[in-house]
């Protein structure tokens, strides 16, 4: 796969040298893009990322589209100054269906691996959830701009929202993704953590 193709249209690459090493290895890579179906339609930003995922797909890599049906019910706190309204399971499923319809206008549906994070989170015990919290500290979470601002201004941050970045990072551990692509949001870089 041509390095220039991968780098084109990207603004920030975290671990650029590692990415280039993975691409030049010739190994088939698992490339993940996750979306939480919190509304009926995808955004223009999603379109850009789907095109990048398609480039990896066309180069023979595994394109993994993660539907964050579990995390959509929580709601991504990134950039929010208040708690997101909770969605029902039915709303999330309706939104997910339209997301897939829209995504497959770009991606090859036969070559796209669709996963839902409810597959693992619905099976997780409370003890497992608590054990997951050992991976990050409160101080690390408060480094996130969105949480920091809300904390300093005495605005509520629910425990569910506080766990969201950890939950989202765990998706990548479960999927064993080599590469993650996403819509530009520097606040979300805290949603990723390394496998141990």
Question: What are the functions of these language-model segments?
Answer:
Residues 1-195:
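NTP-dependent nucleotidyl-transfer catalytic core
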């Amino acid at each position: 796969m041509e390095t220039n193709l991968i780098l084109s249209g990207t603004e920030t690459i975290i671990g650029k040298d590692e990415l280039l090493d993975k691409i030049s290895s010739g190994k088939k890579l698992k490339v993940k893009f996750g979306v939480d179906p919190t509304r009926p339609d995808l955004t223009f930003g999603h379109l850009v990322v789907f095109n990048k995922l398609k480039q990896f797909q066309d180069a023979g890599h595994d394109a993994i589209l993660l539907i964050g049906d579990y995390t959509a019910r929580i709601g991504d706190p990134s950039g929010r100054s208040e708690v997101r309204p909770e969605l029902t399971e039915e709303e999330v499923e309706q939104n997910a269906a339209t997301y897939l319809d829209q995504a497959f206008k770009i991606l090859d549906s036969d070559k796209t691996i669709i996963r839902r994070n409810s597959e693992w989170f619905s099976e997780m015990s409370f003890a497992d959830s608590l054990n997951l919290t050992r991976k990050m500290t409160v101080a690390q979470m408060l480094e996130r701009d969105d949480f920091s601002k809300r904390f300093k201004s005495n605005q509520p941050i629910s425990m569910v929202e506080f766990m969201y970045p950890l939950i989202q990072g765990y998706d990548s551990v479960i999927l064993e993704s080599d590469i993650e692509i996403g819509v530009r949001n520097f606040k979300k870089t805290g949603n990723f953590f390394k496998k141990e």
